[in-house]
């Protein structure tokens, strides 16, 4: 894959700075997908962009789509893959409708995926934030959860409904612990996918569940600036579509 990236960069007649930007974005893409290109790995990559500003997301997706086309055009892929973006006001409006989240609490054998879904929908956490969440950051007595990101801390109230689901996950270093290490993005994606499919909601991606959290906060009367702060965002710019 490294050689393919180099060949792709050489085919682009762009400045040195642009070459560096392409290289950085594509190396990051390969790291997240582990060099495996499939519809599932592309979804995992797209979920990893959730924390970025819209402009950065657009740039990275453009670079990856150009690279994917290059691979297909040079017979390095047997089909053309493409990262999909939401297009048109109608599809945006559809995505912003409130859903019945009580389905997340129904009994399920997919307990790990269930807790991941609950943390996203009720606390607005991203899969990457959940992956780094340690047991010490959870205080069930005071019903709070502390998230550390980029040197900043934010303390979130843990809904009492989530406490029973958290209790069995606090014995290791991480809430989702792999012998003292964190699991991969692919693991979180797979666990969430298993769970939402089991409750008949295969379209409830991490992004959609996070949107449900935002919509709930709006219904409770909070401003976009307040919600941005709760989500750990520096500005509310990426939340403009919720106005």
From Swiss-Prot:
<feature type="active site">
    <location>
        <position position="149"/>
    </location>
</feature>
<dbReference type="InterPro" id="IPR020876">
    <property type="entry name" value="Tyrosine_recombinase_XerD-like"/>
</dbReference>
<dbReference type="InterPro" id="IPR044068">
    <property type="entry name" value="CB"/>
</dbReference>
<keyword id="KW-0229">DNA integration</keyword>
<dbReference type="GO" id="GO:0005737">
    <property type="term" value="C:cytoplasm"/>
</dbReference>
<dbReference type="InterPro" id="IPR013762">
    <property type="entry name" value="Integrase-like_cat_sf"/>
</dbReference>
<comment type="function">
    <text>Putative tyrosine recombinase. Not involved in the cutting and rejoining of the recombining DNA molecules on dif(SL) site.</text>
</comment>
<dbReference type="GO" id="GO:0006313">
    <property type="term" value="P:DNA transposition"/>
</dbReference>
<dbReference type="InterPro" id="IPR002104">
    <property type="entry name" value="Integrase_catalytic"/>
</dbReference>
<keyword id="KW-0963">Cytoplasm</keyword>
<keyword id="KW-0238">DNA-binding</keyword>
<feature type="domain" description="Core-binding (CB)">
    <location>
        <begin position="1"/>
        <end position="72"/>
    </location>
</feature>
<keyword id="KW-0233">DNA recombination</keyword>
<dbReference type="InterPro" id="IPR010998">
    <property type="entry name" value="Integrase_recombinase_N"/>
</dbReference>
<protein>
    <recommendedName>
        <fullName>Tyrosine recombinase XerD-like</fullName>
    </recommendedName>
</protein>
<dbReference type="GO" id="GO:0009037">
    <property type="term" value="F:tyrosine-based site-specific recombinase activity"/>
</dbReference>
<feature type="domain" description="Tyr recombinase">
    <location>
        <begin position="91"/>
        <end position="243"/>
    </location>
</feature>
<comment type="similarity">
    <text>Belongs to the 'phage' integrase family. XerD-like subfamily.</text>
</comment>
<dbReference type="InterPro" id="IPR011010">
    <property type="entry name" value="DNA_brk_join_enz"/>
</dbReference>
<dbReference type="Pfam" id="PF00589">
    <property type="entry name" value="Phage_integrase"/>
</dbReference>
<dbReference type="GO" id="GO:0003677">
    <property type="term" value="F:DNA binding"/>
</dbReference>
<feature type="active site">
    <location>
        <position position="210"/>
    </location>
</feature>
């Amino acid at each position: 894959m490294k050689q393919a990236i180099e060949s792709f960069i050489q085919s682009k007649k762009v400045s040195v700075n642009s070459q560096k930007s392409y290289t950085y974005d594509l190396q990051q893409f390969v790291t997240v997908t582990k060099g495996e290109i499939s519809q599932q790995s592309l979804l995992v990559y797209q979920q990893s962009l959730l924390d970025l500003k819209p402009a950065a997301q657009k740039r990275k997706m453009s670079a990856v789509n150009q690279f994917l086309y290059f691979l297909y055009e040079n017979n390095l892929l047997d089909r053309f893959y493409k990262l999909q973006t939401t297009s048109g006001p109608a599809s945006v409006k559809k995505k912003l409708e409130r859903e019945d989240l009580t389905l997340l609490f129904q009994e399920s054998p997919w307990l790990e995926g269930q807790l991941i879904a609950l943390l996203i929908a009720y606390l607005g956490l991203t899969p990457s934030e959940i992956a780094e969440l340690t047991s010490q950051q959870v205080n069930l007595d005071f019903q709070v959860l502390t998230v550390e990101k980029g040197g900043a801390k934010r303390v979130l109230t843990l809904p009492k409904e989530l406490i029973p689901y958290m209790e069995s996950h606090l014995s290791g270093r991480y809430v989702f612990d792999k012998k003292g290490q964190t699991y991969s993005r692919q693991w979180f994606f797979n666990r969430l996918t298993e769970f939402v499919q089991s409750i008949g909601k295969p379209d409830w991606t991490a992004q959609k569940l996070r949107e449900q959290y935002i919509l709930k906060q709006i219904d409770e009367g909070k401003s976009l600036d307040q919600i941005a702060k709760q989500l750990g965002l520096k500005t509310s710019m990426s939340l403009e579509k919720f106005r």
